[in-house]
Every structure is written in structure tokens, then in C-alpha cells.
Amino acid sequence: MPHSYDYDAIVIGSGPGGEGAAMGLVKQGARVAVIERYQNVGGGCTHWGTIPSKALRHAVSRIIEFNQNPLYSDHSRLLRSSFADILNHADNVINQQTRMRQGFYERNHCEILQGNARFVDEHTLALDCPDGSVETLTAEKFIIACGSRPYHPTDVDFTHPRIYDSDSILSMHHEPRHVLIYGAGVIGCEYASIFRGMDVKVDLINTRDRLLAFLDQEMSDSLSYHFWNSGVVIRHNEEYEKIEGCDDGVIMHLKSGKKLKADCLLYANGRTGNTDSLALQNIGLETDSRGQLKVNSMYQTAQPHVYAVGDVIGYPSLASAAYDQGRIAAQALVKGEATAHLIEDIPTGIYTIPEISSVGKTEQQLTAMKVPYEVGRAQFKHLARAQIVGMNVGTLKILFHRETKEILGIHCFGERAAEIIHIGQAIMEQKGGGNTIEYFVNTTFNYPTMAEAYRVAALNGLNRLF
């Protein structure tokens, strides 16, 4: 006789991965519950990560545009805004996103349960509710989408009022004049842009020898130059020896012997999965040192009825990819296999000022692979649309095979880069000879547009062939 469960599946977490999984499951007729530890749905992406940081960036970039564009400002007065005012803008966006996502669950009759989940056995969860009660829930299968949080080394006092991580920085109540940022990954670089855009002094401590080494080197070098040009002090190949909080700020002692002092510190060096409270040992699952789970191509863990998606499985740790992972896992859970799969070349968007976006191979990778490629470039300053809106900083770079004309990689630096990249991505994904740089020469673009950069870059690259 088949076992009776409360639900066909329980999804732990309501971020992009959890939402994608839950929506995919209910659309296939499954009885689903979503467990969310906080009062509102959306996960870290909506409340502490992607959405608020991008809302902050947008507000700051508009202030920069006002102060630098002679159409708006004669430089006799500068527009300034407090960090608190800019945070209010982010809060408004968060509230809109939360209401919208709550509506998704309500319209699809997907039950939301608030509390902290932990496994009791292979098919049973205990739910620690906010009122102190404990509920027992059973399901045939589970999808873990509990996300990640900023990594906290034990020798850093995050209870100090001037030491922040990328979550708590959104609760800053003072106006910093000087910020230390430890960790020059994506989050560190994005916040360096935000604070410098607010005219705050920034020291960016990088534990490696260049910024964002996974990027095409020209993109990384462009970001380094613009940071330098804006006044950000970048310190490469440095690690902290000791971090001490004091009454008027933070002092960082580096292993190189240097000492740095600032009003506050943003520690942005790594993240860890939110798995420590799930009691995974009760179902025979283990995580790595960063709290992450290993999965197969269908997002199954070592326990075939337990799936995991999003930040909790590590790379690529992107909200966009997490949603797709959730959708694919839902299909695999219901049907036993997934016909859909993540695309091979996942685009990355880095919301520094200016933006950076990439898809496909870098020049360094193609050179190491001994692929005969050529480069086509378009400078934003040569585009009519960029001249009209005063968006002169930036470039689009297309890497393509010299012989087949196949597009191998696209890299964009400049305002709206994360939007512009998708035009090229759409062509790269075409099969049967559809992926060719000649598409951009043979099609007609609206004029004037930023999309026209593809035609300019394609002509530039094809003209290099002989």
C-alpha cells in the first residue's frame, strides 16, 4: 500500500531557486508547500542581495549622471543624497517585489509556511514556527533552496557597529566618509562603485593579483582603470592579519605590515550555504566546508528524493541560473528526468559603475585552447545613441572564429551592458549555422540605438580578416 504524505514535495526557501521549483511543481499538479524562515517571500536575492544593491546602484548612477552631464548641472552645485535616502529607494523596490512574488504563490494555490525547517528522517521535517510551536510535515520529495549568507570568519567581530557584511550594510544608519572593503569579488566591486559614487573614500582590499580574474582581461583592466580614475584605492595581493573595531571606526592590520583605518568595514569575502540548521545528518547528507551540497545533472543530492538548487550548490550562484535550476529540478522530480537543462554559456552581469557583462569564452581561454579567433570592437563613444544620452564610456567586444565566423564570446563594458549582452547571446544560442557574426551585418538595427554596437563591432572584426 503506497505511503500517504502531507505533500508531494516541500520546497525549503522562497528565493529564485525555490520560486522556480515551486511554480514548476504546482504547474504540473503537485501538492506543494514552501517553507520560508522570514516573514516575507523572496529570499536573500530580494531582501539583501540582488534587488537592493541594484536599486542602490541605480540611484547612485543617476546622481553621478546629474553631476557630470552639462545638460543638468553647470558644476556650480552638486546633487548629493544621504545613504539613508538611497536606502529608502531600495526599500520601495523590495516592497514591490515582495508583493508581486507573494501574488505568484497565492494565484497558484501554493502554501507558504513560515519557520525554520530541519529534517527528522528521510520524509519528515520539523518546522520551528515563530510562535515557538513545532509542526511535523511529511513529503515524498524535497527541494532544498535555502540560499547562502555572507561568510563570517571567527576572528572578525561582526557585532561591532562599524563592521558590516553585505547583508547588514543595508542597515547602515550613519553617513560614512571612508569605507574599507575587504574582498574584491563581484559584491566588493559593486559596493566600491556605489560608495565612491556617493563621494565616499574607498579602499578596496583584493586578496588576488587582479580584479575579477574570471573576466576577459580587457574587461577587468577597464574596471581597474575606472576605479583608479574615480579615486578608489585598490590594494592587490593583501590579506588581513587582524581587524579591530574602535570607537570611531575600524583598523585593519594587513599581513604585509600595512595598517588601514576607516569609518567602517564591509567584509565581502565569500559566502556559505544556509544548511547548518537543516539537520542533514538525519538523512545521511553532508556538505562541504562552505555548507554547499553536491548534486547531479538533475539536481539530485546523494539522496535521490532530495534535490538542491541555487546558491546552496555553489557555482554559478546567480539568481537567473537559480530560477532555471529550480524549474529543471521540478521537472525531474515529477517526471523522473528533465528534458530542459541550463544553457552551456550562462551570461554574467556585474553591476559596477559602469556595468560589465559577458557570455562565452574570454580571449585568454581561446588563446590557451589554440582557437584561431578574431576580435570585433565597438566603442560606445562612436555610437549616436551613446552621444545623445552622454554614455560615452564603454565598449562591446565580439570574439569569433576566423574560419567559421562562429561567435565564441561577447564582452561588454559600459552602461546597460547587462541588457546589451542578450542580443549577442540570442545569436550564440542558434543551431545549425545560425550562430554567425555575419548576422549582425546582414540585419537592420533601429537607429540610433545601443544595439547598433553589434553591427559596428561585426564590421570591425570582419574587416580584420584576410
UniProtKB/Swiss-Prot annotation:
It catalyses: NAD(+) + NADPH = NADH + NADP(+). SUPFAM superfamilies: FAD/NAD(P)-binding domain, FAD/NAD-linked reductases, dimerisation (C-terminal) domain. InterPro entries: Class-I_Pyr_Nuc-Dis_Oxidored, FAD/NAD-bd_sf, FAD/NAD-binding_dom, FAD/NAD-linked_Rdtase_dimer_sf, Pyr_nuc-diS_OxRdtase, Pyr_nucl-diS_OxRdtase_dimer, STH_gammaproteobact. One of its GO terms (molecular function) is NAD(P)+ transhydrogenase (Si-specific) activity. FAD binds at E36, R37, Y38, Q39, N40, V41, G42, G43, G44, C45. One of its GO terms (biological process) is 2-oxoglutarate metabolic process. Its EC number is 1.6.1.1. Belongs to the class-I pyridine nucleotide-disulfide oxidoreductase family. This is Soluble pyridine nucleotide transhydrogenase. It comes from Escherichia coli O9:H4 (strain HS).
